From Swiss-Prot:
Keyword set includes Transmembrane: yes
Compartmental location: Membrane
Cofactor stoichiometry and binding remark: Binds 1 [2Fe-2S] cluster per subunit.
Protein name per UniProt: Cholesterol 7-desaturase nvd
Broad class of enzyme this protein falls into: oxidoreductase
UniProt gene name: nvd
């Protein structure tokens, strides 16, 4: 809400500035007289630039000024929105190929390995709350399924299968919200969001009992709309905890990033237990970028990130949770800068949600919610949404999110080009990786979907 009010205020000021500029240019015979007094514009008259050209110059100046103000506003106040495409990060375009061609080639040639089930049981993000206004309908692909996510006039968010059981129209494409129901754009059938039952067929005398669309168990918490998946249709056995500072409005939305990763879902959270990779992949300063061919360039080797990490699972009743404790230090020219030390608690809740909690003496407190949602068996949508203390200037959390994004995209380059190894060659210092795999296996059931090979094709 705070960002919405700021945006509306800026738009109002921008419209007022444009209107005043236009009135000024139209009504003043020579704007340069008014702007600079009677003496300075004499040069304009002698060179023939008085009148219309001066008005044009004033318009250009006003336009440039407004553009600069808009850029400054976005930099200082607007949330950071950085959304990457499927082939935008982690692929090397060589020999005249585009990134898309390189990505397709990698996916086609990569050995998939012996994979765990592709859709673990748990809670998954489908949308951020601010993306779904009252009366909105969104089409989302999650866990290989098309769903329609809509917000009823009662303000509640609902998730149902996208395809109408009548004749298969997509409820999210042209469908509209009526009260707490979604109306099919094809024949006007209306389905209740709370249970999926059809409550109205415009041309039928009676609505049959069997007329219903699948309704996904869902909840809205911490600024996220989440759905529950269990391969056997079981009800949720645990909940995603509430971050009370978000609910009370003490921490406000400051931005999000979104990436698509071509890998098995388990590979992404497994990074938390892969302690050794931090020293090799994430030590170079963020100024050295994300392309792993150049991150160890001598140009930027004077900046280093140093990490101390511990990963551990939580005991009952929170066995579905784990924790990674991170201590970060920055060195420049070999000198430690203690004011930039940062302690982070990364708490994973189930297979798809991680809370990255920050606390710093002068940079303030906040959380990045790291969410992994399977789109297809080997395609994950990963979002990072940051909420931060409202009293801290937005530039601070935006910088933190941008820095985290740079480090994350280094991992993306690895994930997008690696294969899953079910029996990896590990040394004793890698013991946390095996512990993590045993912990993560609790989210699989006997009937969890698997990827199968048939005649060199993937059949799901």
């Amino acid at each position: 809400m705070e960002n919405t009010r700021a945006s509306l205020m800026f738009k109002t000021l921008a419209v007022a500035a444009i209107g005043l500029s236009a009135t000024f240019v139209m009504l003043v015979r020579d704007p340069s007289d008014t702007l600079f007094g009677g003496g300075y514009p004499e040069l304009w008259r002698r060179t023939g630039l008085a009148g219309a050209p001066t008005r044009a110059a004033a318009c250009i100046f006003a336009g440039v000024f407004l553009l600069a103000m808009g850029w400054l506003y976005r930099l200082l106040f607007a949330p950071l929105e950085l959304l990457r495409g499927v082939d935008e990060v982690g692929y090397i375009a060589e020999d005249g190929r585009s990134r898309a061609q390189a990505a397709n080639e990698v996916r086609r040639r990569r050995k998939t390995g012996e994979l765990p089930p592709v859709y673990p049981n748990g809670w998954y993000r489908v949308l951020d709350s601010h993306m779904l206004e009252r009366g909105d309908v969104k089409s989302v692909t999650v866990l290989g399924q098309q769903v329609a996510v809509f917000r009823g006039q009662d303000g509640k968010a609902y998730v149902v299968d996208a395809y109408c059981p009548h004749l298969g129209a997509n409820l999210a494409v042209g469908g509209r919200v009526v009260g707490g129901c979604i109306e099919c754009p094809f024949h006007g059938w209306q389905f209740r969001g709370v249970d999926g039952r059809c409550v109205k067929i415009p041309y039928a005398d009676k609505v049959p009992e069997f007329a219903k669309v699948r309704c996904w168990p869902s909840c809205e918490i911490n600024g996220l709309v989440l759905v529950w998946f269990h391969c056997d249709g079981l009800e949720p056995s645990w909940r995603v905890p509430e971050q009370s500072q978000i609910t009370r409005g003490e921490w406000v939305y400051r931005g999000r990033t979104e990436h698509f990763i071509n890998a098995h879902i388990e590979e992404i959270p497994e990074n938390a237990a892969d302690i050794a990779h931090l020293a090799h992949l994430h030590t170079p300063g963020i100024v050295s970028g994300v392309d792993l061919r150049y991150t160890n360039s001598k140009t930027w080797e004077f900046i280093r990130h140093d990490w101390k990490v511990e990963w551990k699972p939580e005991p009952e009743p929170n066995k579905h949770c784990s924790q990674m404790l991170v201590k970060h230090a920055l060195t420049v020219f070999g000198r430690h800068w203690p004011l930039l030390d940062l302690d982070v608690l990364a708490r994973q809740v189930g297979p798809g949600v991680v809370f990255l909690l920050f606390e710093h003496s002068f940079l303030g407190r906040g959380v990045i919610m790291h969410c992994v949602t399977p789109v297809e068996p080997l395609l994950q949508c990963v979002s990072h949404t940051i909420f931060y203390q409202s009293s801290i200037p937005p530039l601070v959390p935006k910088f933190i999110l941008r820095a985290e994004c740079i480090q994350f995209e280094r991992d993306v380059m690895i994930w997008n080009n690696k294969t899953y190894i079910s029996k990896p060659m590990l040394v004793k210092e890698d013991s946390a990786i095996q512990k993590h795999r045993r912990w993560f296996s609790q989210f699989y059931s006997e009937n969890s979907p698997r990827l199968r090979y048939q005649h060199d094709t993937l059949d799901f």
